[in-house]
Amino acid sequence: SLAPIWDISLRTLKRCMHETYEDCPFYEQLQYAMDSRSQILYTYMVSGDDRLARKCMDDFRRSARYDGMLNCSYPCYGPNVIPGFAVYYILMLHDHMMYFGDREFLRIHMGTVDGILEYFRRNLDERGLVGKVGGLNGRDRYWSFIDWTKQWDQTSGMPHAGLYGPITMESLLYRLGLLRAADVMEYLGRKQVAEEYRERAESLKKAVNTFCTDEEGMYLDGPGVKEYSQHCQVFALLTDTVTVENGRIYLERTLSDSVTYAQCSVAMGYYLF
């Protein structure tokens, strides 16, 4: 019976819902964008109630900084930025469009969305990739966290490539944000903006495939850095940066070798599966 799994899953969700969503009900008790997106989707499935989800998205909108970035957790006592986490806020809005279709609610957030995407655009390097926008937690201005996985313990969840330069995952997340934002803009009747976002996403796809792959076409953790992760293969597939046929080969390779390839954590497993 799946009943015990259902019970513990629902109980976990409830424990992480107070005046905000929380990454954990005991320790940090912070509303993180990546964590909250998964919790919101679960909430939609079990209740159809979007009140706390709306508040969550409004919270992150209010955390917008002068450069367009959002806090990765909010409410929060001070600046706390993971650039890639701003994309999960865009995904929340796309999810809300798919489940509820509330145009008025979405319109309120579009200025914030454009600010996020402009931040990434301004930080493209000469190759057309998202440049080095962050680094290690507590040492650099922003934290290029991707996932808590064993291979990245020493860099606090950042691919080692981030020690030397840009990381591929931030370019893939930016592409994902552009594609989902384009869908929302088109739904709101802003077709020219949607077209612009898709053109930018296509340019990014070409840059990633030119500079962030090895001789076989598998995605590297950073341009010229011979380290690999499941994460890059997953997000290359999710963004149609790689063909389904090749993407399957690369992903299966990571599934069969958990030593060579950094593995997705439970939290990132949603995107893997």
Regions found by a protein language model. Name each.
Residues Q31-S47, R51-F273:
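Active-site core of glycosidic bond-cleaving carbohydrate-active enzymes
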Residues S1-S36, T43-D50:
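An acidic-aromatic substrate-binding cleft motif
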